[in-house]
Structures are given as structure tokens and as C-alpha cells.
Amino acid sequence: RTDCYGNVNRIDTTGASCKTAKPEGLSYCGVPASKTIAERDLKAMDRYKTIIKKVGEKLCVEPAVIAGIISRESHAGKVLKNGWGDRGNGFGLMQVDKRSHKPQGTWNGEVHITQGTTILTDFIKRIQKKFPSWTKDQQLKGGISAYNAGAGNVRSYARMDIGTTHDDYANDVVARAQYYKQHGY
């Protein structure tokens, strides 16, 4: 099972903001921009597909969601230096922040992806407690937003991404995840 926390295909999304799309050299924004970026990362992502699917099964999270986060955080590792990014604070494909967590495993291995995905599920559970009336799919989106900016930043469904990087984190990740789901994740 990989659907314990909802289904990414049922989540509404506005996709990448222009602040996210422009540095990627795109003249357009929104879901089409997210899909283009996800597509550019697909070849690199496919190197980790087996591990991503294994961790998704183990933790009951859609592998496509894990892939969406990996694309957004590190372009499937393409922007990392010796496994580090974000000015030396973020570790690995999922950019686990060493200021909040002790990074585990190698930057691109199963232990790391398990740690990052566990951090995600912890945030989803916090959002479930904070917003019990939201649907599972809404709580999943809230958890994705919290993965970037913390559970305290999620104040309402409509505005959950305000305060995330480029104010579009969950919307962009969800759109990328929908792309990866169409490509066997």
C-alpha cells in the first residue's frame, strides 16, 4: 500500500510560481512549468526509482510524492555538491536540514530517503491533528507544505504555501508528483 496519506492525483494544484519557473529558464508558470521541470529531472530520478518505490511501500507514501519532493529539493541530485545543497545545511536528495535533524545514510541511498519520507509523514500527522476536518488529500498537501516551512506555517488550506520557498512549495511538488505518477512512480 502507498495510499495511507491520500492520493496526489486528487489534489488541486496551481503548480510552480513564476518565482520558481523563471530561474529554470521558463517563460511560463503554473502546472505546465512544474511538469517541464519534473520531466527534465526524470532521467536522473529514474536512477533512484527502485529505492523510492521501496521506501514508498515501506512507509505507505506514494512514491510519486517522494519523487516530487526530490525534484523540487535537489533536481534528483543534479544540483548537490558531495550530497550537500542549500548553503551546506541541506543533505541528500530530499535535503534533510542538519539544523533540525541528524542526516542519516548516504546522500542518495535508501536510509536517507527513508529519513526524508519519515520527516514528511511526521508533518502529515501533525497537519492531521491540526486540521482534522480536512480530507486526507488536503492533509497530504498540508504535510508537503510543512516539509518546507514547518507545521506552524500552515494556517489555512488556501494559503498554506504563503511562507514556503517562492510561496508555491506544495503546489509545485504536487504538480511534479502528478507527473511522476504518470511515469510509473
Swiss-Prot record:
It is found in: Secreted. Pfam families: SLT. The keyword Hydrolase applies. Its main location: secreted. It comes from the Eukaryota. Keywords: Antimicrobial, Bacteriolytic enzyme, Disulfide bond, Glycosidase, Hydrolase, Secreted. Belongs to the glycosyl hydrolase 23 family. This is Lysozyme g. It comes from Cygnus atratus (Black swan).
